[in-house]
Design a protein with these regions (language model features):
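Short, glycine-/Ser/Thr-/acidic-enriched flexible segments
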Residues: 33-34, 98-100, 144, 204, ...
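Active-site bordering "gate/hinge" segments
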Residues: 1-240, 368-380
Length: 380
């Protein structure tokens, strides 16, 4: 039986995220079996809009064969066909759905990281085309049994959670995300005038210099669901201690209850209840891996629980997250790394955030609303 929520999600991605027009070329990519419930309505709705849609679907297990059996040369290979293809398409949507979320757990971590590092060439090319306005991209998810199990939910409950977080059941989902954009853009502008943030919580007292950096509002253009404001901090301006109460899931492995000490923007001490050796290995991946590439506020309050999926977890309303490794060049970030490890700090119970010494956030909420500026009101 056809579920209208998948149709609504497809329409939101095409009309709000990608702003797809007649005559444009759209690539739909994902794991064939896992992504199929969303691939079909995306293709159907793209055709209705007069676009030229095609699919690039992977079979479960193929990447594992490459990581397990491939030579170093094969792990480093980036398809020139895919790179040329990227230059020829107007828009793409990636469906991050997996039938088995633990398929890489027992494979060699260094080999998997090597393969992912090579694929960054494709990601960088896509990022540059997005920045130039030549390409539009969005990442989203079609719920699977495996991802529901990770979230400790039944598939039906997980579907409800996902579609609620995406607001596809609202009377006008596109208008909802436009309004979110106005609010978050106003918040980003406000944070743009801040020199230093101080984050205080359980086992956490961290100062983050953000002076001169641009804050970005995330409201459904490149992720669905969305709901965060983020920036790249000054590379030498992060100092103190921070505890991440939620597990970090990276390449199928977990790091549980990580605690970091940072000095002048670098991790100088790290421990974790689970996965400590793995965390330390990631910090040594390259020169930039122990630096901070991102600091962000999670502001989607429909996402109210941890699900072991970073698309949702980094946006949990009332949290902040920090990413080790690669920063955002467009926002002023200068840290370079093959790593981008998101770590989530839960501030919903006792957390406080100070902006230049003034308390602006308590227990997962900003203390005052922002009023959309003329710039924010132009979010469309």
């Amino acid at each position: 039986m056809r579920d209208p929520r998948y149709d609504a999600l497809a329409e939101l991605v095409l009309d709000h995220s990608l702003r797809l027009q007649a005559g444009e070329v759209l690539r739909i990519e994902g794991e064939a079996a896992a992504a199929a419930p969303l691939v079909v309505p995306l293709h159907r709705e793209a055709i209705k809009r007069g676009a030229h849609a095609y699919t690039a679907l992977d079979l479960s297990g193929l990447k594992e064969i490459l990581v397990a059996q491939g030579s170093d040369e094969q792990l480093d290979f980036v398809s020139p066909i895919e790179l040329r293809e990227l230059d020829a398409i107007d828009a793409s949507v990636t469906i991050w759905s997996e039938t088995n979320t633990r398929s890489f757990t027992r494979l060699d971590t260094d080999r998997r990281q090597r393969q992912l590092t090579a694929q960054r060439q494709f990601a960088i090319r896509r990022r540059d085309r997005i920045a130039s306005g030549e390409h539009r991209w969005c990442g989203t998810l079609s719920p699977t049994e495996g991802q529901a199990q990770d979230a400790d939910m039944s598939l039906a409950d997980y579907e409800d959670f996902v579609f609620r977080a995406c607001h596809v059941l609202d009377d006008d989902p596109v208008d909802h995300w436009r309004q979110v954009g106005e609010r978050l853009q106003a918040r980003a502008e406000e944070l743009g005038s801040v020199r230093e943030l101080r984050i205080v919580g359980e086992d956490t007292d961290l100062t983050v210099v953000v002076e001169g950096r641009t804050w970005r509002a995330a409201y459904g253009r490149q992720n669905v669901p969305d709901g965060e404001v983020y920036t790249s901090p000054v590379e030498t301006g992060v100092n103190g201690t921070i505890r991440f109460g939620f597990p970090a899931v990276f390449v199928g492995r977990e790091i549980d209850d990580a605690r970091l000490v940072l000095e002048n923007g670098r991790v100088v001490a790290a421990e974790a209840v689970g996965g400590e050796d793995y965390l330390r290995s990631l910090l040594e991946l390259d020169e930039g891996a122990s630096g901070v590439g991102e600091i962000a506020f999670g502001l989607n309050y429909e996402i109210d629980r941890f699900t072991r999926n970073i698309l949702f977890d980094e946006k949990i309303g009332g949290t902040m997250h920090m990413a080790l490794g690669m920063g955002f060049e467009a926002l002023g970030g200068q840290n370079r790394s093959a790593l981008h490890l998101d770590l989530i700090c839960d501030l919903r119970r006792e957390g406080e955030v100070y902006a230049d010494g003034e308390l602006v956030w308590r227990s997962g909420q900003f203390l005052h609303e922002t009023r959309p500026s003329e710039l924010a009101a132009r979010v469309r």
